[in-house]
Design a protein with these regions (language model features):
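Sec-dependent signal peptide recognition
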Residues: 1-10
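Active-site/pore-lining binding-face segments in mid-to-C-terminal subdomains
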Residues: 13
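Conserved binding-pocket/active-site segment within a compact domain
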Residues: 19
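Glycan-recognition and catalytic cores of secretory/periplasmic carbohydrate-active enzymes
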Residues: 22-269
């Protein structure tokens, strides 16, 4: 009886962690784990999604992150779109988290493995002791040259690269989602440390430099930093989120002026 009681308590605690994580950000929404799909087209589609996710190899998804952390990749990265600068790894982590929250044990196992590997990458970046690398969890190619010049206001490498912050945002979101949907505390810690990196890497830039930098596709950096503020109530995250708000776009829209013609929908919309 004691064993059964302890088991029930542990299960209840795990479920409450997931619920608390989601309610921390989305108080008007119910947790994914509260829904059980019955046989039908929605369950069929969900199961197909999971089956497709499980065809991928986590070590190949993680290869860009290990490489940029100075660690030997365990397997070669995927080619083509899946290997484009490492950003698909963040998408993959989000997908694992969402499906783990619906009860997929294999997705949960893979999610936890990826988080453990990303912890190794962050630790390796911290051991480098370089001014750009502390708390970095990115897989962007040539990260050392890119971010060491970027933090000084030199955007020559940044603008010559394929959408660095768009890329990194996917891993910010993946780590957040692993905590948000599954209550994974290690993912939460990694997410907040990565947000600390974003605060630090932009701290020396003027408002004018930030606005210029945001002319390059930058994903939802303002969103994830605002989420970090909602989680911790630490003002530094909200301040940084506001710096990532592209005023050239948002100011006219706040005044009901349409400024979207000829802009890139995936960036501005």
């Amino acid at each position: 009886m004691k064993i059964l009681t302890s088991f029930i308590t542990l299960v209840g605690l795990a479920m409450s962690l997931e619920t608390m994580a989601q309610e921390k950000l989305y108080q008007d929404e119910f947790p994914l784990g509260d829904i059980v799909l019955l046989d039908g087209p929605l369950k069929h589609a969900r199961d197909l999604n999971i089956a497709n996710l499980l065809k991928y190899d986590c070590d190949r998804m993680l290869a860009p992150y290990r490489k940029e952390a100075g660690l030997a990749p365990r397997k070669p990265t995927y080619p083509n779109w899946d290997g484009l600068d490492g950003h698909v790894g963040g998408h993959y982590l989000s997908a694992l988290a969402i499906n783990a929250a619906t009860g997929s044990e294999e997705c949960k196992k893979r999610m936890e493995y990826m988080i453990g590997e990303l912890q190794l990458c962050l630790d390796a970046n911290n051991r480098r002791g370089e001014d750009w690398s502390r708390n970095y969890v990115g897989g962007f190619p040539n990260s050392a040259k890119l971010w060491s010049t970027f933090r000084k206001g030199d955007f020559s490498v940044y603008f010559g690269s394929w959408a660095p912050f768009y890329n990194l945002h996917k891993m910010f979101a993946g780590l957040r989602d692993a905590w948000l949907y599954c209550g994974n505390e290690q993912a939460k810690t990694l997410f907040l440390k990565f947000c600390d990196w974003a605060v630090d890497i932009t701290s020396g830039l003027s408002d004018e430099q930030m606005e210029r930098m945001l002319g390059n596709e930058h994903g939802g950096m303002d969103e994830v930093l605002a989420d970090a503020f909602a989680i911790t109530l630490q003002q530094k995250y909200l301040n940084c989120a506001r710096r990532f708000a592209h005023k050239q776009l948002l100011t006219p829209m706040a005044q009901h002026h349409d400024c979207l013609d000829n802009l890139h929908a995936n960036t501005q919309i």
